[in-house]
Amino acid sequence: MTSTVAHGAGSAGPADDAEPMSARTYQVRTYGCQMNVHDSERMAGLLEAAGYRRAAEGTDADVVVFNTCAVRENADNKLYGNLSHLAPRKRTSPDMQIAVGGCLAQKDRDALLRKAPWVDVVFGTHNIGSLPALLDRARHNRVAQVEIAEALQQFPSSLPSARESAYAAWVSISVGCNNTCTFCIVPSLRGKEIDRSPADILAEVQSLVDTGVVEITLLGQNVNAYGVSFADPALPRNRGAFAELLRACGDIDGLERVRFTSPHPAEFTDDVIEAMAQTPNVCPALHMPLQSGSDRVLRAMRRSYRAERYLGIIERVRAAMPHAAITTDLIVGFPGETEQDFAATLDVVRQARFSAAFTFQYSKRPGTPAAELDGQLPKAVVQERYERLVELQEQISLEGNRAIVGQRVELLVATGEGRKDTLTARMSGRARDGRLVHFRAGDGPVRPGDIVTVEVTDAAPHHLIADGGILAHRRTRAGDAHADGQTVRGIGLGMPGIGRPVVPVAAEATSCGSAGGCGSADGAGSSAGDPQ
């Protein structure tokens, strides 16, 4: 669907009145899940290929692109609040352009312009590649452009990319989702699952490694389903395709770490566990959303598994990889949740001993079956349960981290992970299991992207401390690239990291696939992340 809407006085002027395209700068603001981060890198790549350049930090961009999330009312309010903040600048700088894409744009469509008529471009989740042309058309014609495709036009991974990191990269293996969780709006916004071919994925991974990337995260709404809906009709369905893909990644020289997100417990199979355990560069980390420990609530959520099956998967994972870090997503206050249901969730959390849990308070979202269910709970009840769950998980996380004190861990040095690093003279990195470690680098030239070995000296619920200095340091091509200025700012390494602080306020987003999409829960995360 394509439509145009005439702007008022705040619209962009004709091309002759505007500064040359080569001088125009851009900024992409991302809300939501890791799939949106992946897509934002593509938006940035498209703009740079079209002659735009990234705006310097602290400066006003000529083009501001919002890549949105549609999972909660909070996400809506945040977007429209930020758009309102730009309205005065739009009035005084008519050549400045605003574009809104992502899931909220796919959902609201023309309604977005009624709420924010100063927006220049609205585009959806299926036609990211149209962004430069839509901006150009809106700028030349002084008419807002709304283009929402109903089906995927091109895999985002095939588009140009301006990646945020020299050492870690997202690699999408599929788009869309075939599940029907009652709290999730993703299938209606991103469509049914479509899988990329293994050859395309492995070619992208190889090209990334050739540029110095040492860690990749495979992205999908439900990575376990990979292989059932290949875009290429010549490829047969293959239920074992994801395990085969993990093993194939293990054959790529120079690729040191492989992560993935997110699996669905209903389709988690033992061949994936075997591939994880037997492929050295696949990290001993698993983020597997639970959502609730109550079988009755899981049934109402249409999650297609029960607590016993979930705990059985964890048991088999730990049997194969005893030191694996397992994290999860939890929704508190789903419609009809009783105190008995909540107690069942607490019980499963105690048994599972998660390294971290990304916990969110439910809020109903129009367009999801759960929004129509009876038994919507009072906010006070949900908040009280949420606080109890976070307290329990904090205790479990701290106990798990304290058990690592005295151990040596290998870190991929990161940038932008520790807010207090400058004050404490520490740097930060991620262990192979995803834990965040703050360490003292000493006087050596340690760069983001390098590999260091340290000994853990202290622990907190969301991070580890290594103040004993560096025991080993390996310089990498990724570190060289970072030192050469080939990265702008850091991104998280793989799936929600173990080690972000408790923030008892509404989180950026929730999701039906922690990296792959967005669901319909609301609230704060005991470790900021997105639920599946």
Swiss-Prot record:
Location of the MTTase N-terminal domain: 24-140
Presence of keyword rRNA-binding: no
Record EC number: 2.8.4.3
Cofactor(s) required, per the database record: [4Fe-4S] cluster
Protein localization: Cytoplasm
Protein keywords: 4Fe-4S, Cytoplasm, Iron, Iron-sulfur, Metal-binding, S-adenosyl-L-methionine, Transferase, tRNA processing
Transmembrane segments: none
One MF term in the entry's GO annotations: 4 iron, 4 sulfur cluster binding
Family annotation (InterPro entries): Elp3/MiaA/NifB-like_rSAM, Methylthiotransferase, Methylthiotransferase_CS, Methylthiotransferase_N, Methylthiotransferase_N_sf, MiaB_methiolase, rSAM, rSAM_horseshoe
Chain intervals for the UniProt region annotation (Disordered): 1-21, 510-532
CDD domains: Radical_SAM
Cofactor note: Binds 2 [4Fe-4S] clusters. One cluster is coordinated with 3 cysteines and an exchangeable S-adenosyl-L-methionine.
Low complexity bias spans: 523-532
Binding site for [4Fe-4S] cluster 1: 33, 69, 103
Catalytic activity from the UniProt record: N(6)-dimethylallyladenosine(37) in tRNA + (sulfur carrier)-SH + AH2 + 2 S-adenosyl-L-methionine = 2-methylsulfanyl-N(6)-dimethylallyladenosine(37) in tRNA + (sulfur carrier)-H + 5'-deoxyadenosine + L-methionine + A + S-adenosyl-L-homocysteine + 2 H(+)
Main location: cytoplasm
Residue span(s) of domain TRAM: 402-470
SMART domains, alphabetized: Elp3
Keyword Transferase in record: yes
Superkingdom, natural source: Bacteria
Function: Catalyzes the methylthiolation of N6-(dimethylallyl)adenosine (i(6)A), leading to the formation of 2-methylthio-N6-(dimethylallyl)adenosine (ms(2)i(6)A) at position 37 in tRNAs that read codons beginning with uridine.
Family note: Belongs to the methylthiotransferase family. MiaB subfamily.
Protein name in UniProt: tRNA-2-methylthio-N(6)-dimethylallyladenosine synthase 2
Native organism: Mycobacterium marinum (strain ATCC BAA-535 / M)
